[in-house]
């Protein structure tokens, strides 16, 4: 299950309170029969526009879960950039830094090429198993797709030019 570090009082005020909430909910989950392996902690990232320390607090939470609790983590990437222009750059930078801190999963748009490429590159730079091959395969596939697209566009342009000259 996804452990959301929230209490009846609402959002935690700081990282220490967030850790206390994580511990309380974690202990309760175990007492109810949940297995450690079934628990994933949400980093609970806020928008940087409302809280300038939002990213840092999320990184600290992720590191705590990884290093102290040995728990996987997840977070919604786009929360960090809410209300900002050119959000994909903020989201991508946030993702790469969160991966470095131990982020296991992200709620993200997989069609955002920059974001996905950064995730593959981050895994490779952290020497995660088989990440080098995964990165190379991804880049090769993207290069092939780009070449196919460019071929289709060129052929379409050639056909359009001959049609406008009155030839078939």
What do the predicted segments below correspond to?
Residues 1-38, 46-74, 78-168:
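ATP-dependent carboxylate/acyl-activation modules
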């Amino acid at each position: 299950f996804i452990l959301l570090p929230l209490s009846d009082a609402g959002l935690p005020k700081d990282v220490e309170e967030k850790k206390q909430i994580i511990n309380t909910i974690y202990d309760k989950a175990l007492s109810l029969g949940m297995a450690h392996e079934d628990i994933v902690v949400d980093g609970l990232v806020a928008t940087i526009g409302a809280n300038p320390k939002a990213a840092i607090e999320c990184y600290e939470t992720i590191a705590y879960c990884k290093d102290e609790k040995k728990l996987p983590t997840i977070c919604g990437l786009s929360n960090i950039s809410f209300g900002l222009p050119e959000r994909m750059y903020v989201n991508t930078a946030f993702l790469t830094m969160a991966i470095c801190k131990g982020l296991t999963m992200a709620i993200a748009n997989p069609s955002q090429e920059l974001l996905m490429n950064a995730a593959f590159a981050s895994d490779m730079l952290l020497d995660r198993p088989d990440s080098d091959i995964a990165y190379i395969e991804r880049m090769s596939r993207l290069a092939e797709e780009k070449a196919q697209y460019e071929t289709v566009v060129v052929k379409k342009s050639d056909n359009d030019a001959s049609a406008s000259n009155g030839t078939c």
